[in-house]
Amino acid sequence: MTFWNEEIETMPEEELKAMQLKLLQELVERTYRDSGFYRKRMDEMGVKPEDIKTLDDIRKLPFMKKTDLRDNYPDGLFVKPYDELVRVHVSSGTTGKPTVVGYTQKDLDMWAESLDRGMTSFGMTNKDMLQNSHGYGLFTGGIGIHEAATKLGATVLPTSTGNTNRQIELMCDLPVTTIAGTPSYLFHIADTCDQKGIDIRKDTKLRKAIAGGEPWSESMREKLQNRTGIKIFNCYGASEFYGPMFLECEEQAGFHIWADITLIEILDENDQPVKDGERGAIVVTMLQKEAFPLIRYRIGDISSLEWTKCKCGRTHPRLQRLSGRTDDMLVVRGINVFPSQIEAVLGEMPFLSPFYHLTLDNENYMDRLVIEAELNEESLTEDMVELSKMSKELDKRLKEVLNIKAEVKLVLPGTLQRFEGKAKHVTDNRKYD
């Protein structure tokens, strides 16, 4: 059995929780000192750093929500000046405003540490070659996994997204043993290999995969594993944390949440803690973040947490497969998409009415987003050139905001259903079985 940091990864639960308390107290003290946002919130609740005497006292602290990220755009939540930052990542926000996250060198080191523990736990070593099919750039997935694998000593093939034929060619020609990507893209690669007559078992050295960025079921994982011979390990994270952070070990029995890095609460609908193993809303506190503190952040995911020791020997809590969301965020091909973002873009277009509908499906395991937008009476025309111009303008703007390609359909006035109460704008037909 191999560990990246055996002393920490196998530390008894009591010692881990004592470490968590010390780190939490230090976090609250420095954040109260350095962050106007948190200091104001804590003062409003009558809480001081010295009030945090036990781990249960975390419930005295205020929650942080996604709207707080929007309201403090771009850098109102930073507690370090830019000359102390080494990187900034940007991801989509709830109203078209992106979320801007700053990183010190220690932040990047801690991010890589978390991933390296996870990569080691499922058997990845410096002898592996990782084909990284996550997007690079402002998105955290590609660079985060790349740097962690490099620190591990593995060889990285930075293919990024797209150009599937080229990716498969390299996968066959080079000694690639591990691939990272979204579940839907891994299915797409498998489909394309079948079409080309390529047997992944025989024609490649690929045996492991890291899958993250979008939901999928256990039965889907089993289908892909049986089909390809690849053992697939799920990954969980978010840009607000650092990026992708937590992986499954060889047992595939949940995400190992490193207790010295992250404190996760699971709360019921009344914001009370649930029993160990019960499902509820995930609330995240990052214990060692420097540039962009995160205390009691409502990420919006639903899951359960177990502190039982894993068969792999690791003692840290395990987060189980996500079972839903507490908000209206959609995850499409690994990208966070909010209906409010789309609504804002549609509102910019003078030729559209306020009525729209989103439909999602995942035929052939690849997410497909169709946006139906209703023309207004003033813009109604039979001029195909003009209609094409409108469609292209809308298509371009949506791609700029969403960072993914959607299928846009302009429909006649009165086509879309009207609702007397709250309008239903989304139909999600995706199946994960």
Language model region names:
Residues 1-90, 95-113, 117-121, 270, ...:
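Nucleotide 5′-phosphate-binding alpha/beta core
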Residues 1-7, 18, 64-227, 233, ...:
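Active-site phosphate/ATP/adenylate-binding loop shared across adenylate-forming ligases
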Residues 179, 288-402, 421:
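AMP-binding/adenylate-forming catalytic core of the ANL superfamily
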